[in-house]
């Protein structure tokens, strides 16, 4: 299955609690931290909810 790399590029400080929880649930902590996750509907939905805070790249 395909994988995606998610990088936290903006701070969740001052954002809604749901958005902050989504950042933590994805395993992102500090700015510029990255995680590699499976590309599925659940992860894509989480990324869409915080798309203004993260960047997404395909991993080959």
Curated annotation (Swiss-Prot):
PROSITE patterns xrefs: RIBOSOMAL_L30
InterPro entries xrefs: Ribo_uL30_ferredoxin-like_sf, Ribosomal_uL30_bac-type, Ribosomal_uL30_CS, Ribosomal_uL30_ferredoxin-like
GO biological process: one example: translation
Gene Ontology molecular function, alphabetical: structural constituent of ribosome
Gene3D superfamilies per the UniProt record, alphabetical: Ribosomal protein L30, ferredoxin-like fold domain
Gene Ontology cellular-component annotations: cytosolic large ribosomal subunit
Keyword Protein biosynthesis: no
The organism's place on the tree of life at top rank: Bacteria
SUPFAM superfamilies cross-referenced by the UniProt entry: Ribosomal protein L30p/L7e
UniProt keywords, alphabetically: Ribonucleoprotein, Ribosomal protein
Family (UniProt): Belongs to the universal ribosomal protein uL30 family.
Complex formation: Part of the 50S ribosomal subunit.
Listed name of the protein: Large ribosomal subunit protein uL30
Species the sequence originates in: Streptococcus equi subsp. zooepidemicus (strain MGCS10565)
Gene this chain is encoded by: rpmD
